[in-house]
Swiss-Prot record:
It comes from Ornithorhynchus anatinus (Duckbill platypus). Lowly expressed in spleen, and expressed at lower levels in kidney, lung and testis. One of its GO terms (cellular component) is extracellular region. It is found in: Secreted. Belongs to the beta-defensin family. This is Defensin-B3. It comes from the Eukaryota.
Length: 65
């Protein structure tokens, strides 16, 4: 029975996404001068992905031309 519980908890841990990569992507986005948001606004450019919880896009305001 204990062995079954161990495999159950290991399978739950295996499905959890790693948090380290999300934190580092948010930091990289901020270094580029952007911010993480669920959706980029019309005047913003999509730089990449943050993948931290629900804030999936790295957005930065476009420079006026």
């Amino acid at each position: 029975m204990r062995l079954l519980l161990v495999f159950f908890f290991l399978s739950l841990l295996d499905q959890a996404p790693p948090a380290r990569s999300g934190i580092s992507r948010v930091r990289i986005c901020r270094e580029k001068g952007g911010h993480c948001d669920a959706d980029c606004h019309l005047e913003e450019r999509h730089l990449g992905g943050c993948r931290a919880a629900y804030l999936t896009f790295c957005c930065r305001k476009e420079s006026p031309r």
